[in-house]
Amino acid sequence: MNLSSLSFRLLATLLGACVVVAPASAERIKDLAQVGGVRGNALVGYGLVVGLDGSGDRTSQAPFTVQSLKNLLGELGVNVPANVNPQLKNVAAVAIHAELPPFAKPGQPIDITVSSIANAVSLRGGSLLMAPLKGADGQVYAMAQGNLVVGGFGAQGKDGSRVSVNVPSVGRIPNGAIVERALPDVFAGTGEITLNLHQNDFTTVSRMVAAIDSSFGAGTARAVDGVTVAVRSPTDPGARIGLLSRLENVELSPGDAPAKVVVNARTGTVVIGQLVRVMPAAIAHGSLTVTISENTNVSQPGAFSGGRTAVTQQSTITATSEGSRMFKFEGGTTLDQIVRAVNEVGAAPGDLVAILEALKQAGALSAELEVI
């Protein structure tokens, strides 16, 4: 055996050892949970988009657009008589919404989405005038203004016909709002950090507590319920941030997801979890197709006979039944076997939904069946 062959075998052995030792499905805490209180907040506002190329609101059908414009002009020192209602096509009333990210500070920009409220055909080319964005408490947290970016296209004729591509009545303004008010500091005055799992799972909570205690010392973390883990932390904000920086990178293997089958009855979409099993069962699958065709028969009387032309309908009904097939599931059948068996009999997605519902009703499906 030469030296190069020995080196290759040694390298292969070491790589194999590394594969065995490395955690199979370790995930970071930051991917499994979020810090309690650290979240975004919804903002909403109302405003006007101007500068549209004739694609704005039809003000005869949206009087609030004219009212908003008159109020705006009044604030700018332009008085419009109360009995004058300008018929404009380059203005649109819009709703504005955005998310105020955690720890946002005054002066920072955030993205906003602008949506038409009335009957504007398109917001392309428009500019949003300054509008306040309020939170759920009624306080103004940001001011929005800017030029819209619209991905769709729309046009409408005088006869009411219209052509549109995508959704031209919704646009975005990157960095279109400036934060004016900061949220209260969620890091002040508590001696614990709360971690909330994205999915309820007692096994994951238990493993998270064990992983944190292993990294920071026994008694650092405690389980509160199937979602929440409380971690002891210093009260100093700087020290808490340092702790969180280390804490969110702790790795653990989460618990297995529960066996579940999710069915969308409207679209025929079926999602089957990896741990779904089927108890022993036999299924027969077949289909019956009924075709109804209508033919019109006209009976024309002879000349000078005094008869009348008769029109009759002739219906032809044909029923065909494709060969029904039966397949059997043994105990502990896995996801791959279920899909393979159903595909072999040529079942459509709608048929698969019916088969899964029947299996659940018969007690042969060892999983939760959720229909959405």
Curated annotation (Swiss-Prot):
GO molecular function annotations of the record: structural molecule activity
Xref: InterPro entries: Flag_FlgI (IPR001782)
Keyword Secreted: no
Any one GO CC term of the record: outer membrane-bounded periplasmic space
Intracellular or extracellular location(s): Periplasm; Bacterial flagellum basal body
Signal peptide bounds: 1-26
Family: Belongs to the FlgI family.
Record's function text: Assembles around the rod to form the L-ring and probably protects the motor/basal body from shearing forces during rotation.
Quaternary structure note: The basal body constitutes a major portion of the flagellar organelle and consists of four rings (L,P,S, and M) mounted on a central rod.
Entry protein name: Flagellar P-ring protein
